[in-house]
Every structure is written in structure tokens, then in C-alpha cells.
Amino acid sequence: MNKKLELMYGSLLHDIGKIVYRSNSVDFAKGTHSKIGSQFLNKFKPFQLSGIVDSVSYHHYKELASSSLLDDSVAYITYIADNIASGTDRRASEGDYEGEGNRQRFDKRAPLASIFNVVNSETKGLANYTYSFEKEQVYRYPTDAKKEYTSSQYAALVNKMTDDLSNKLKVGPDSFSSLLQWTESLWSYIPSSTDTNQVMDVSLYDHSKITCAIASCIYDYLTEMNCVNYRKELFSPYEKTKQFYQEDVFLLVSLDMSGIQDFIYNISGSKALKSLRSRSFYLETMLESLVDDLLSDLELSRANLLYTGGGHAYLLLPNTERARDVLASFEGEMKEWFIKIFKTDLSVAIAYKACTGEDLMNSNGTYSDLWQTVSRKLSDKKAHKYSLNEIKLFNSTIHAGTQECKECLRSDIDISEDSLCKICEGIIAISNDLRDYSFFVVSPEGKVPLPRNRYLSVENQDGAERKIKMNKETRIYSKNQPFVGKQLVTNLWMCDYDFSTLNPETKKQGIASYVNREVGIPRLGVLRADIDNLGTTFIKGIPEQYRSISRTATLSRQLSMFFKFELSNILKGARISVIYSGGDDLFLIGAWDDVISKALVLRKAFTRFSAGKLTFSAGIGMYPVKYPISKMASETGVLEDLAKRGEKNQVALWNDSKVFGWSQLEEQILKEKMIPLQEALTNSQEHGKSFLYKMLELLRNEDQINIARLAYLLARSSLSEELTQSIFAWSQNKQQKVELITAIEYLVYQIREAD
């Protein structure tokens, strides 16, 4: 095996001994987690390679300084990478490792803390939320209850790891992605450090993954410099170590795919509602495939991928001439492909900034500036999308068609006999497969186009395995099902909740089935939402002393898991389909009342998830089923923008006159006003919709005479005196009057006969 691959394995597994140490296993000698880790890993023959074992044994200064390793040992690279990922050079720290002899400083029972404890703490204070140790649960909420991780829990994890390392995991270029997936599945809620002098909010998975990414970059950087004496360059004398931290070894890279929302929503054909989710999944998978193409060109792994979602990706790459050339070539190739396939509907842009180890550790206070610079450079790229040659290419590929696609309305592309372009035809073709199958296959044969003469198809597991055997270039993604397999690139967490597919009667009709009801207005509810001030949170939300690349990776992964995995659990049972759920924004369509009720549940879950440190704003519209989806999207987007004005943390409901705080909607409108009215009407034989309509008419009319008329209407009603007095008092207050009108409208929509 080549040295770089051994380094990737070793740097990813360098802290495996921490889990074994915390298990109190009698099978291993006492000592540091490094020593215990190497003893544990040596049990498994495929992993007994010097680059792997040395990275586990000697990734701390004291052990490395006293070792007799060769000058070209990759353990020196793992040591530097571990320091950068940890956010500090730990050379001067006494007892800087977990193990025997440091029991007072390290608490092996300590749970993983929530990253949100420190997020926005300068404005909202520090929190003390931690996660429980539950091996089988993919997603967990932090709580403020006191917790301890027990040695028996760690022992069970060691047994699981032993079984997998013995029987499932392999060592080789086609198997590394499986190991990376394995560490995510098992280590995401294990604290990287149990040092009581530190904040324990970075998981062992996030730390190990970032260490691997940094190590891979350093290896490529030194290789291009023809440097093979890693000890001299990185370790001894120490002045060389400090100098290396100051070198521009890395590139922070941002990749952006623009035009996503217009591509998804700007359709108007008879199958528009049915193909919405398919269009979203297509673009999401396309972005993942783009990232893997780029990483493959660079001979790097998904460890170097910091984040994907919402049409964006961030990567950590080596600052080498080769990497910069690959980025330029890749961007040009992708832009050309997008122009040929999508014209200007979709486009791609890449920006990057060279950075040092000190930048990534924030030891010089430049970490936030690094991200801001990359963001600014990307904005400049997007503002000047096309070069002269690319504009010429666009003009040369214009197709003067006589027909337009009945779904996307494009006329610059060949149209089939069914009046569909090839892209819409393929997207519609995979719609049913998306509901039933969980494997996305990227291969030379398929239904919708991807770059480099490949196509996307959706298969069951047997179908995916057959395609692998037919073509070794096949790439497979599993959806919400982590697997360990040779060519399985990665599991993609995707929120695929779609209530309409759960019942054979509604499956064929899809989203349109949500207007089928016996009572209540037959309308679709549309929600668009995104997190408030997320960009600021990423750049400045983590206080200066805690900023590091590992915490940024932790924060982005937690947000991604909430919206791509946990959201399905939150929506369970609701008549809703998730059209789009990225790392920070959301688009739902469903029965109008389910959309509102679940929006309130989602807001509470998000508050719980983020320890109250983050909020989101939303627009909620209500539409007839045949209303153009493009207008639903744009109009609800306007409502979302209204909700994000001022203090944010709001919802704009139905129109621009109804912008409420979330608590205001739930407590003052629904609980305080709507529910008492609903109960009163349920218990009364005299009052129904006509009574509500009359009240609405009087409340909406600003004439003074209507105050007396409202008082008269209430006095003659059979409502309780307490409720009539409350209604009249609410009508005299401007804000409460709007709340009352909204409550009555909500109730009318609930009880009116279906069309």
C-alpha cells in the first residue's frame, strides 16, 4: 500500500485507543491511549502496517521525541495534523494525553457536550448541555441533565469495533470510504477529549476526520516540495515546527452551485407537484457527485469535505500547484458542462484562500477573516459568472426549437413526443424509484445526466450491486442507510419524508392528495424557512477562544443532521412532503393545517437542539392545488423575507399583514384565542360559521359603528361572559385585534365544508 493511504488510515484511527482506555478493558496493558490504541489495532492483521500503527502509537510529542522512527515516518505528519485539528500545539503541555497517570485531569466518564453551549454565548450566555451514550440511536438531542458515560458502555462499543475490524473493514484504496463511514456511525457522540480543562464539545469522529484531512493536505504539500525527511521538516528542531505552522499549506475552498431554487420550482406542467422532490434530489445528488469527482481528481477522500448542503460545499485542500491547477481545470470543465446541459439555469463557481496551520487553529486570530475572505471571493466569482469564451460557447449551443417542454418550458433543447425535454423526462422517470429505493447509482447508463458522460439512476440494493459488477467505475450512494462496502462512496443523509407515499390510495396522486378532506378548506400549505443569521454564526458565533476548524465542522454537521435526518422524525404522521431540506433552509408542502402545526413543533425541536442559541424564520402560504408551483414558491419566499425583517425569529402567515413571533402564534393566537372559540362553538347549537363570518366582517371594518355592532353581537350570543368580555377587549387593542382575526380565520378554514 502507498504511504499516503497508510497515513490516511493512521490519522483517521490515531485516537482509537481513547475508546479502549475508557472501557477499562483488562485485555490491554495500562498506559497512554496511544499505547493502548496500537495494541488494540495490532490485533487485526490488515491494519498492521507501519504507517497506520506508528500514527496511532506516536502522535504525541513525548512519545514521538523518544521514538526511533525513521525520518520519513508519516507519524510526524499525524502529530502536526492532530495539533492543528485540536486547535493548539500541545508540545509544552504536561500530561497532554489521555491515559494512566492523568486521571485527575481527564474524566473518562465525561459525556460529549453540545457545540451550542458556546455558540453565540457572548450574546446569549454559556449553556451546559450534553449528549447521552446510546449506541444504536443515529440522532440525539442534548439535555442539561447530568450524565456519565460508563466503562460498560465503552466496552460494548469496543466489542462492536472488534467485530467490524475483524469481519467487515478492509485496508485498501477502495475501502477507505467505508472506514470513514464507520467512524461517523460509531464515534459521532464520543468526546474527542475528556480533558476537564477544556470544553468537550468536539466528537471523536469530527476530530479524527479533520486530522485525516489535514494530514492528507500536508502529505501532498511536502510531496510537491520533494520533502521526505518529515522529522526535520516538521518536528526537530522545534523552530521548524513553528515555522511550518506559519506556511500556507492549505486551501480553504468553497464550491457553489447556483440556480437551484429556480430549477426546482420553475415548472408548471401537470406533473409539477409530483416531480418537485425528484428535482431536488437530483440536484442534491449532483452536488455530491461533483464533490467526489473533484476529490478523485485530487486523490483525496471525503475526509477533506467539510460540508455539503444547500448547493454549497466547503473543502480543505493542499496548497499545491497541482491542486490549484486541478481546481481551475475542474471549474472550467463543469461550467462548460452546465452551459451545454442547462444553459444559464444552473452554474458552478469555485473560490479559495490559502491558509496556514495557525489560521486553522486561530492562534493568530485570523480564522474568521479566512472564512469571510473565501465568502467574498466566491461572491465576486458569482457576480462575474462567465468568461468571454464561455459566453461564446453559450451562444454556439443555442437551439432554436419550435416546441417547449411542458414542465420546465424550455424551448432551447430537444423535445420528445410527450412534449418533455430529456432532463424533465428523466426526472419524472425516477420519481417513483425515489420513493421505493435507497441507492443512487452514478454510472455510464441511467436516466438523468451528470458530468463526465455519466447518469443518475435509482436502484434497490440488488440492482446497485449488479451495476457495480457490470462497471467498476460505478459510484454508489446509499440514502439514510450507512453500509460498509467496497465501492459504496458514502451514505447520504437526505430528508425524504413524504406522507403521500405511505398509503397506496394517495401514492399515485402524490402531493395533490393533501387537499382531499371531508371538513376544512381544501388547500395546500407551503412553508419556506431558513436559519436566522447563520452566516454570522459560522464566522463569529463561536467565541474567539473556541474557534477552530474542528468546531466549525462539528457545527455544520450537527445542523446538517438536524435538517437531513431528524426532520423526518419531527414530521412523522403529518400530511406533508419535504421538497427541500438543506443544511440551513427548508421547503415543505402539505395539508395547510398540518404545515402550521408541524412548523410550531419544528420550532420547539430546533430550540431544544440548539440549546436556544439559534432561531429560524418562515413564510407560510396557502394555495389551491392547481396554483402554479413557481408562484407558490416565490410568494412564500416573499413571506419568508418579511419574517426575517427586524428581530427575525418570526413567521409570516398567509399574507404580509400577519407577521408574528412563533410564541405569539402558538400562545396568543391559537391557544388563547382560537381554542376557546373552537370549544365554545363545539358546545353550542346556536353558533356556527355564520357567527364567525359576522365577527370577521365587523373586526375587519375600521368604522367606529362596528364596535357597537360587535358588542351587540356578542351580547346576544350564548358565549360565556368571560369569553365575550375577552373578545371585546381584544378588539380594542390593535395587536390583539390582528391576533383575533387570525384566530377566527384559522377556525373558519378548519370547519368550512370542503369544496
From Swiss-Prot:
GO MF, one example: exonuclease activity
Mechanisms controlling activity: Synthesis of cA6 is inhibited by EDTA.
Coiled-coil stretches noted in the UniProt entry, renumbered to this chain: none
Note on how the cofactor is bound: Synthesis of cA6 requires Mg(2+).
Catalytic activity: 6 ATP = cyclic hexaadenylate + 6 diphosphate
Cofactor: Mg(2+)
Keywords attached to this entry: Antiviral defense, ATP-binding, Endonuclease, Exonuclease, Hydrolase, Nuclease, Nucleotide-binding, RNA-binding, Transferase
Domain GGDEF: 522-656
Keyword Lipoprotein in annotation: no
Gene Ontology annotations of biological process type: defense response to virus
Region entry HD domain, spans: 1-87
Superkingdom of origin: Bacteria
EC number in record: 3.1.-.-, 2.7.7.-
Similarity remark: Belongs to the CRISPR-associated Cas10/Csm1 family.
PANTHER family from the UniProt entry: CRISPR SYSTEM SINGLE-STRAND-SPECIFIC DEOXYRIBONUCLEASE CAS10/CSM1 (SUBTYPE III-A), CRISPR SYSTEM SINGLE-STRAND-SPECIFIC DEOXYRIBONUCLEASE CAS10_CSM1 (SUBTYPE III-A)
Known role: CRISPR (clustered regularly interspaced short palindromic repeat) is an adaptive immune system that provides protection against mobile genetic elements (viruses, transposable elements and conjugative plasmids). CRISPR clusters contain spacers, sequences complementary to antecedent mobile elements, and target invading nucleic acids. CRISPR clusters are transcribed and processed into CRISPR RNA (crRNA). ssDNase activity is stimulated in the ternary Csm effector complex; binding of cognate target RNA activates the ssDNase, as the target RNA is degraded ssDNA activity decreases.
Domain notes: The N-terminal HD domain has ssDNase activity. The C-terminal GGDEF domain has the cOA synthesis activity.
Miscellaneous comment text of the record: Encoded in a type III-A CRISPR locus.
NCBIfam families membership: cas_TM1811_Csm1
Assembly: Part of the Csm effector complex that includes Cas10, Csm2, Csm3, Csm4 and Csm5.
Annotated protein name in UniProt: CRISPR system single-strand-specific deoxyribonuclease Cas10/Csm1 (subtype III-A)
Organism: Enterococcus italicus (strain DSM 15952 / CCUG 50447 / LMG 22039 / TP 1.5)
